[in-house]
């Protein structure tokens, strides 16, 4: 990765790859080293969703951080994102990560850790509305670029489970039938989940 970074000095991809690989080390990497890699990435592409996502995973409780550290990073990134940037959806990625960690740790898949309210508590609902406002509202072009599919699926999944049809319906219409495997697979069979919510909200092609 470092050789690629030297060969392609303006390309953020090698730095994204370095951060992705860093979380696979049993003890992670030194904070200063991660910070240097992040500075290199951020300087080349300050609004890279994939780059931010790799850091978010690194900071998650599943890897080398905590839920608090992960959410702080996601909300800080969302807070400085320009209107129309997809970075606010990092908060929905963080909520999925928290759910996965809690579900794996729970002996009783719902009652022991309150997973039934994970998607629809006040904080989760507010987060969905905030991402919707900052990212989607105001878009004049409702076409979906291939690189946006996964991010839109994360927001649609969150809106569905939060019980926000005013957000979920337009998102499902934008997606049409282009459901991605994740995050739907974390709450059931992905195809069945995507189809179920389209039917529940009466979204037609």
Residue ranges and their predicted role:
Residues 4-5, 12-14, 162, 168:
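Small-side-chain structural scaffolding
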Residues 13, 117, 130-133, 182, ...:
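Short, low-complexity intrinsically disordered segments
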Residues 25-28, 64, 98, 162:
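Structural motif corresponding to the intra-repeat A-B loop/turn of tetratricopeptide repeats
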Residues 7-21, 45-61, 79-117, 145-156:
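Amphipathic alpha-helical repeat scaffolds of TPR domains
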Residues 145, 149-150, 154-205:
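Extended, charged low-complexity segments
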């Amino acid at each position: 990765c470092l050789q690629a970074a030297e060969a392609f000095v303006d390309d953020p991809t090698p730095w994204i790859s370095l951060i992705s690989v860093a979380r696979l080390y049993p003890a992670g990497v030194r904070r200063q080293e991660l910070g240097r890699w992040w500075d290199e990435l951020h300087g080349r592409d300050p609004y890279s969703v994939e780059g931010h996502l790799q850091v978010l995973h690194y900071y998650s409780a599943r890897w080398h951080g905590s839920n608090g550290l992960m959410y702080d990073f996601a909300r800080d990134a969302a807070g400085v994102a320009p209107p129309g940037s997809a970075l606010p959806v990092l908060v929905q990625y963080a909520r999925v990560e928290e759910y996965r960690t809690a579900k794996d740790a729970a002996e009783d898949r719902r009652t022991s850790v309150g997973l039934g309210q994970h998607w629809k508590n006040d904080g989760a609902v507010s987060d969905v509305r905030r991402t919707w406002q900052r990212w989607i509202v105001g878009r004049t072009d409702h076409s979906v670029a291939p690189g946006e599919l996964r991010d839109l699926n994360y927001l649609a999944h969150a809106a569905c489970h939060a019980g926000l049809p005013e957000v979920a319906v337009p998102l499902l219409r934008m997606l049409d039938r282009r459901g991605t495997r994740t995050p739907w697979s974390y709450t059931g069979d992905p195809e069945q989940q995507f189809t179920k919510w389209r039917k529940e909200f009466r979204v037609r092609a």
